[in-house]
Amino acid sequence: MIQFKDSYKHYGANGREVTALQPLNLEIRAGEVFGIIGHSGAGKSTMLRMINRLEEPSGGHLLINGQDITVLDRMGLRALRRQIGMIFQHFNLLSSYTVAGNVAFPLKLTGASDAKINARVAELLAWVGLEAHANTYPAQLSGGQKQRVGIARALATRPQILLCDEVTSALDPQTTSTVLQLLARINRELGLTIVLITHEMDVIRRICDRVAVLDTGRLVEIGLVTDVFLHPQHPTTRSFVMETEHIDTSALDQDFALVKGRIVRLTFIGTDTYLPLLGRVARETGVDYNILSGRIDRIKETPYGQLTVALSGGDPVAAQAAFAAAGIHIEELRA
């Protein structure tokens, strides 16, 4: 649906050229929730804003439904933007307009009749749970309510694509969960393609189908969230995962020094997460196991579990083979 073909962005600064986004090639599929993660300055906002040409690409091509948007004239660009909604980090609401007025604003720009605007606004406010606040002004709302107004406004013109620019970074954890649940519902029930940027891997884990990792303007990793989250390849990705998992590597090293045997990390995905595989393999191979750390959680709707265990006695090699035969991913941390 959205294709970046050698798309890049350069800026001029103090007489020299700065690369914000190096030539990028990737495709975002229709109907998916696609996450873009990176540290500040990685190029994720630039990439997101190129999709509706709030940032003009310096070169390459950017296709939406097969149409190269880099060659659109003003009228074509206006039509394109009606198909793309956008939600902002700091809400960007009009302070002098009521909640209903903010949601109605993009519809007024299309020239829709008052009757159609009023009906659509009422529908959207009910959808995001703000029908009781139609005549309230933004200053009277909480952060989560403001973001729900922003979401309703972004949906006003019935877009096909929803761009989310750090939409949870200004929210508390409980409100973040509410907003992510609303976005998941939008994707599920309305079928919108959602492109979301964040610096929080936990947001990616909870809502996205696939993720791209950017580092200083370069795409360094891309794939299904289950693959990227559980088996990160690039150092930048690994650092995001470790921050999310709250892994203290120095503490782990101390734990490793206190135990004997082969140390492995086992990753279980799906229904395997709830099976007693560790005990079964221990009985079959005669190994003793010592659990050093572990967790069970979900990546979107998919359950997963990770255990770091020390294997000793019996036949550790046979134990690893048995885990592999059961479809469990094994990472050897110490032989």
From Swiss-Prot:
PROSITE patterns xrefs: ABC_TRANSPORTER_1 (PS00211), ABC_TRANSPORTER_2 (PS50893), METN (PS51264)
Predominant location category: membrane
Organism for this UniProt entry: Xylella fastidiosa (strain Temecula1 / ATCC 700964)
Cell inner membrane listed as a keyword: yes
UniProtKB keywords: Amino-acid transport, ATP-binding, Cell inner membrane, Cell membrane, Membrane, Nucleotide-binding, Translocase, Transport
Protein name, as recorded: Methionine import ATP-binding protein MetN
Assembly with partners or alone: The complex is composed of two ATP-binding proteins (MetN), two transmembrane proteins (MetI) and a solute-binding protein (MetQ).
Stored Pfam families: ABC_tran (PF00005), NIL (PF09383)
GO CC, alphabetical: plasma membrane
Annotated family: Belongs to the ABC transporter superfamily. Methionine importer (TC 3.A.1.24) family.
Catalytic activity reported: L-methionine(out) + ATP + H2O = L-methionine(in) + ADP + phosphate + H(+); D-methionine(out) + ATP + H2O = D-methionine(in) + ADP + phosphate + H(+)
Record-linked InterPro entries: AAA+_ATPase, ABC_transporter-like_ATP-bd, ABC_transporter-like_CS, ACT-like_dom_sf, MetN_ABC, MetN_ABC_transporter-like, NIL_domain, P-loop_NTPase
GO molecular function: ABC-type D-methionine transporter activity; ATP binding; ATP hydrolysis activity
Domain ABC transporter residues, every copy: 2-241
Compartments, record wording: Cell inner membrane
This protein's encoding gene: metN
Function: Part of the ABC transporter complex MetNIQ involved in methionine import. Responsible for energy coupling to the transport system.
Residue numbers binding ATP: 38-45
Keyword Lyase belongs to the record: no
E.C. code: 7.4.2.11
Top-rank taxon, per record: Bacteria
Membrane topology designation: Peripheral membrane protein
